[in-house]
Amino acid sequence: MYSAFSAHSLLNHGLYQSTMSLPDTPTPPRNLLIDREYVILIDTEGGMCRLHPQRFNAIDPIRHPFPGIVTNSVIVGEHFFVGTWVERDLSLARLALLDLREPIESGIEMSDLRVAVDAGKSNHHHVAGAVWSHILDAEPLAICEHDGDIVFCTHHRGIYRIGINSHEVWRRKPLGWDWLSDLPDGDVLVKLISVDDSIWAFSLGGGWVELDGSTGHVTRKGIHQFKSSTHDVWYGGDGNWLFSLSENRMAWWNSEAESISVANVSGPIQDACMVEETWFITGWRQDMRWSASQFHSEPDIGVRAEIGNKIVNRNEGGFWVLDNRGQWSDFVIQGISS
């Protein structure tokens, strides 16, 4: 469910130290999950470790519970990590839940898994240390938490809501949009986001749907004609959505005012959060600040040396950005525009 922590806020931790005092992550990041009690680093090879929630130093060694890259992940409830793993060459996919109160473990290596596949024993191997690990018959595409449960979708199979005990709450058939029927993979989902009592789903071709979180029924749906593919989506509250698009573009949509604006960027957006009606965005060697007063114009742009991977809002202390090397720096644009 959307909250202040959806914007990677660290208000309750009282952090005001400089990024100069923050250690590099032990390996280059693919994702960084931040919750009230946990900060989980997921690296580009599927390695995972916990970071200290205030100092951001590694408190565990890097482990590999999944045999490859973690494709989707989310922290669920107070203590649980849920992730997916896909190996297309082997036609394997897993969905697993880890208890973050327990040490993260390393599991089977890819070379050994290939041997198991050749021997017809791939089903004997699951995610190491998992409370549960399930075989999926289709590629998992997106995942989110909703009211303490797990919501995920798989390719052309549908959307599912399950509890942390893995019991099914509901499932629904795949979403579709008539206008996207002629667009290859136009209806393939790329993002699920929980907002209040709803779950929002976004597709590669610009389709969007608001689902009733308790039943999975469609509340409303539509299509954005971006003339670009949707790569990622962030929610900023009060109906504000930011889209990372192909063709070096991004879009700001307000679903309440039914207004939309598109801007050019230097490359893919990696992360974004909204504070005081202003988007703070990092990505391809640039940080951007896009305020409500600039809705129909270009955002402020600052150049950074590396690719920004994650933004952390430290409130009065400004913003930290974790780059693709695993190093921290300040958001390059200072202050909040009016």
Cite the ranges covered by each PLM segment.
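Acidic, serine/threonine- and glycine-rich low-complexity intrinsically disordered segments
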Residues: 124-129, 135, 141-247, 252
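Structural motif
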Residues: 45-52, 88-107, 157-162, 205-211, ...
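Beta-propeller domains
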Residues: 39-63
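A short helix->beta-strand "capping" segment at the edge of beta-propeller domains
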Residues: 1-29, 52-61, 120-137
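Long, mid-chain structured domain cores
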Residues: 59-169
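Conserved beta-strand element within WD40/beta-propeller blades
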Residues: 40-42, 82-83, 151-153, 200-202, ...
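Repeated scaffold domains used in trafficking and secretory/extracellular systems
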Residues: 24-36, 64-79, 129-131, 135-147, ...
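Beta-propeller fold detector
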Residues: 58-64, 106-128, 169-177, 219-225, ...
